[in-house]
């Protein structure tokens, strides 16, 4: 049997809506965003209201439950007009997934819907000067001091770091030899 790679009617409708939104709402403001280095919060919330942020996340957490292919289509459509704006979807999807799978349920129920609505803008701190985005080679250390962790080291290339409300930072909590198994998220 052959695999069917055709988009469903729902995927086509979402794709057309996202592409139209990108052309009509995002593309006209590209030069201004590029000059000011900032994405308008109203635009982000509008994307959230259309279900464009975290589309593959469960409906119970504010997503569309639409799957990764649909989410990828949305990201591609938004990137067509402005790659920087597409980071909102990309980071929202990554952070939403991490929280929905690894955070306490009450944290996921509180934070993920705000990400999907575009009310909370997020970033992920993984990349380091010495190892790029190789999670097994992270040097930034997290050491417990009583009830707190103290992070010591460097991160670089945190997309949208100057605009976000929340950031997850990946840091080493165990031996270097343990590679990715000794990495925690803060």
Residue ranges and their predicted role:
Residues 140-143:
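A structural signal for short hydrophobic beta-strand segments in well-ordered beta-sheet cores
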Residues 118-127, 169:
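A short, Trp-centered hydrophobic/proline-enriched beta-strand micro-motif
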Residues 26-38:
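C-terminal helix-coil-helix/basic helical segment that borders enzyme active sites and/or dimer interfaces
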Residues 1-10:
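Intrinsic disorder at enzyme termini
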Residues 38, 63, 131-133:
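Conserved, non-catalytic sequence blocks in retroelement Pol enzymes and Pol-derived host proteins
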Residues 49-119, 160-166:
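Internal helix-loop-helix
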Residues 11, 22, 74, 104, ...:
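Residue-level signal for inorganic ion chemistry
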């Amino acid at each position: 049997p052959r695999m069917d790679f055709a988009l469903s009617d729902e995927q086509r409708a979402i794709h057309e809506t996202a592409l139209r939104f990108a052309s009509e709402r995002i593309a006209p403001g590209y030069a201004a965003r590029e000059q000011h280095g900032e994405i308008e919060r109203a635009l982000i919330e509008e994307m959230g209201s259309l279900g464009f942020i975290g589309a593959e996340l469960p409906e119970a957490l504010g997503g569309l439950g639409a799957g990764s292919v649909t989410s990828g289509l949305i990201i591609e459509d938004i990137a067509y007009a402005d790659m920087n704006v597409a980071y909102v979807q990309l980071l929202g999807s990554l952070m939403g997934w991490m929280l929905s799978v690894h955070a306490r349920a009450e944290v996921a129920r509180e934070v993920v819907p705000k990400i999907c609505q575009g009310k909370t803008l997020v970033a992920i701190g993984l990349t380091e000067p010495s190892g790029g985005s190789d999670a097994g080679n992270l040097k930034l250390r997290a050491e417990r001091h009583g009830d707190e962790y103290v992070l010591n080291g460097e991160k670089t290339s945190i997309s949208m770091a100057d605009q976000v409300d929340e950031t997850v930072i990946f840091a080493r909590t165990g031996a270097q030899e343990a590679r990715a198994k000794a990495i925690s998220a803060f």
